[in-house]
């Protein structure tokens, strides 16, 4: 086995900190900064120090091994990209303010790549001419850029982040399904090797487009995603992808709709209190503008509208809430008293499936200080489109079996898409088919957040003392600590050299003038799997071995320590 380098902490460009950073909100942010893995450069921009770079490198290695195992080929494309391909697919506009746009000295428009679907499509268009050239899977590991409005949580949500993005190209849909399955299995192997607890959940495609999408989520309190798990069946989904069943009910016995005076009740809370009813008996109607046109969104009064779902439904159109000015010159829209009946053709009405045909509601009467009761969906008003647009709650019924769902927070660490022909259509990617005619290529897109995986590991694998890395991703295999005296330092360096000669990666704390207590604290903070201490019994050739994860410690001879750590 080749010699591994010994990293001396006396030479290491990584200072540990006793206190949490003032702006740190989540555990991974605190520990990665305190342990000397990363440093903040600016809002959403991070510098990776030597220890952090080693962890990143280990994750990259695992990703490469598993991608290569499914026949994927690694390439490197530019991060600075021309506008034209993104204009052709519509994403120059769709990405909105999250896209970093810039111009060269001649006024040409460019962007910093958030993902590379367009550029990979053009690459394959240039290289592949026949069905014989396909299928092919290409990937890269590269920094991506998104102009986050509020970068937060350390490396979890930054403006620059390291990502593995891969793309599959097939002639037939069956081939796309196979490429998708290959990636799905590879991702499972990757995250299992990393030691991450994860869930595979149904997801929405968003601006990426496509017919099928799944996310790989790492459960963690610091996560920005919320997913639902069914305790009774195998259903799991990002809350944005959950769809409530549309179940019509019989409204034969519901009396005719009737206006009722309700002065000073412009909110659901005041209305329910005034009438002595539950908020769930009322119908809330939220007005939004979609590319400037007013749309009404109907949900039960006890539920909140999930604007992410509304935006996803209308994507790529821009969605915004109405303002007071939008009511001017619109006598049919009475602020605080809007109802779906009588809105007219000028206003599109979408409703949550809970507002099913036959359900009866108390809702606005489109008159000041007036509501209407016994307003029945499908009888007194029509719904243009049913879309699940409510914020999912704990206990909502599972779409598969009806059992109450359980909600958890998680970090998105991977996302896979069956894109279909969206990008091939926009950029005219065809190859010569087996029948001698042009065949439009179908495509998949697959991402892993490499730098985000570091944060997810730090969230899941830590204790009150610091980080606890697995051997696969740790910056070293063994952290050797010289307690301080010359004899102890000499033994520590000797053991380190022998371990390195056997191929063991060693981080040795040989710092002079640093107390043993500080060294021990730093060793636990940094989180290398095995800690070897050359301490008070160094003169006897005895050292202490400590397992960072379990906390178990044992005094053994140097020879025994070397045997254990090199076996």
Curated annotation (Swiss-Prot):
Signal peptide extent: none
EC category: ligase
PROSITE patterns membership: AA_TRNA_LIGASE_II
EC number, as in UniProt: 6.1.1.15
HAMAP family: Pro_tRNA_synth_type1 (MF_01569)
Biological function: Catalyzes the attachment of proline to tRNA(Pro) in a two-step reaction: proline is first activated by ATP to form Pro-AMP and then transferred to the acceptor end of tRNA(Pro). As ProRS can inadvertently accommodate and process non-cognate amino acids such as alanine and cysteine, to avoid such errors it has two additional distinct editing activities against alanine. One activity is designated as 'pretransfer' editing and involves the tRNA(Pro)-independent hydrolysis of activated Ala-AMP.
Stated name of the protein: Proline--tRNA ligase
